[in-house]
Amino acid sequence: HRWITGKHPRLFDPARDGFGGDTIARQFLFSAYQAELYRELQLSTDPTLRAIAGKAEREVRYHLDHAAQWILRLAGGTDESRSKIIISLRDVWPYIDELFVDDELTERLTGAVPRPSALRAGFDRTVASVMTEAALEIPQVQPAWAQGRSGVHSTLMGHLLTELQWLPRRHPGASW
């Protein structure tokens, strides 16, 4: 399938050599983002979003802690594990900025949802704390893409959508 051919976004790339640190790097960074998002959503003007965020924050904090502990273990382990987690973080890092881009939708939802850009400082503090403890440097890389929320995607999005639509197209009307 597509995962085998390599035609998919790097952010969703399965571990290139079986190294679980690729998954840990993605989980750590995305959980750091989600932790800020759900913390801020608890201040939402929408009571349903507040309730969901309250429950979700506890879960994502668990995932953040789990991934952070693995970052520390890998960075403090062998030379090979340290080198590989550095590569994993560097490979995922270009996709981080897109999480914090404000757009027209978030502007219209002011009060109900936080501005993505307002989440960046907390994210940076969380990530910097773990990276410092692990004696790792923040990767200095160019952002990969920053318009996905506004509907502008690379051609790789088509490959991802094709992969996601394979089952429903193969088995129309299928249900669990």
Where are these regions (language model features)?
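A contiguous pocket-lining binding segment that forms or flanks enzyme active sites
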Residues: 48-111
